[in-house]
Amino acid sequence: MSTKEKLISHVMKEEPVGSGNKVTVVGVGMVGMASAISILLKDLCDELAMVDVMEDKLKGEVMDLQHGSLFLKTKIVGDKDYSVTANSKVVVVTAGARQQEGESRLNLVQRNVNIFKFIIPNIVKYSPNCILMVVSNPVDILTYVAWKLSGFPRHRVLGSGTNLDSARFRHLIGEKLHLHPSSCHAWIVGEHGDSSVPVWSGVNVAGVSLQGLNPQMGTEGDGENWMAIHKEVVDGAYEVIKLKGYTSWAIGMSVADLVESIIKNMHKVHPVSTLVQGMHGVKDEVFLSVPCVLGNSGLTDVIHMALKAEEEKQVQKSAETLWGVQKELTL
């Protein structure tokens, strides 16, 4: 008899039981791993699968996390074969070419489209009912690409969008007012990145509109220069990349925040990238961030934001820029 047989007496043969809330992270780069650890530490799933084409890096990251299994309640698996991702509830795609210092997110696009042509069909094959969350940049265009390649209904494909931009915005407003970001309500919509749109008209603390107190807020004529805060949001990622080479922690936490709302069916509102055709005067098939309700079925509702004419114009301009790039893509 083996030690195991001497220690344990078998009562019944276990049937394989699928995990009810399995999450897959595609890509074990900086963002993928920050997302993975954030999801693990928030205890969001029974099983976390990781997949990547870089076999050694993947194996090392999976082993490193598994060595911490004692401190977690999640089964951790990883393989370059997508069968390891089977029956995922949420699949987070972080894989792709990384933004170089000074490179715009839009410049990355065709490089990443080609990578997606391999990834997306594999996800669909093994998790045909999953909710697909795109994080790779340029996120709005790649969410559109994932939607097209997957054939999924629009409510099951979303991009991490401006969830992080809005978090940065709220953090910076909080710094200026000496308040916790959760008490500073503020939204950034539109494109994740350089042409994102700060909705100054909606910025409030405890229901008190800041623009009501300072009508010039967010304009050139504002003596307090609140506009600089949005510039800081846009430049924030570039600044972090310049200083440490990449961004990871905040986007990882942002991803876990979105995964939590889906898995726990929270019906929380997040600014995420979705199909906005027909909203805010957008005519083309583009994905941009607007406030959306997230739950177990995916992206269930969109909140009608009252945008000022100038804000709406900026959203339309973003949409035109993205469509200009999208229509040149070979899918």
Curated annotation (Swiss-Prot):
Disulfide bonds: none annotated. Pfam families: Ldh_1_C, Ldh_1_N. It is an enzyme of class 1 (oxidoreductase). Transmembrane segments: none annotated. Signal peptide: none annotated. Substrate binds at R105, N137, R168, T247. Keywords: Cytoplasm, NAD, Oxidoreductase. SUPFAM superfamilies: LDH C-terminal domain-like, NAD(P)-binding Rossmann-fold domains. It catalyses: (S)-lactate + NAD(+) = pyruvate + NADH + H(+). GO terms for biological process: lactate metabolic process. It is found in: Cytoplasm. Pathway: Fermentation; pyruvate fermentation to lactate; (S)-lactate from pyruvate: step 1/1. NAD(+) binds at residues 29-57, 98, 137. CDD domains: LDH_1 (cd05293). GO terms for molecular function: L-lactate dehydrogenase activity. Its EC number is 1.1.1.27. Homotetramer. Belongs to the LDH/MDH superfamily. LDH family. PANTHER family: L-2-HYDROXYCARBOXYLATE DEHYDROGENASE (NAD(P)(+)) (PTHR43128), L-LACTATE DEHYDROGENASE A CHAIN (PTHR43128:SF10). Interconverts simultaneously and stereospecifically pyruvate and lactate with concomitant interconversion of NADH and NAD(+). This is L-lactate dehydrogenase A chain. It comes from Paranotothenia magellanica (Maori cod).
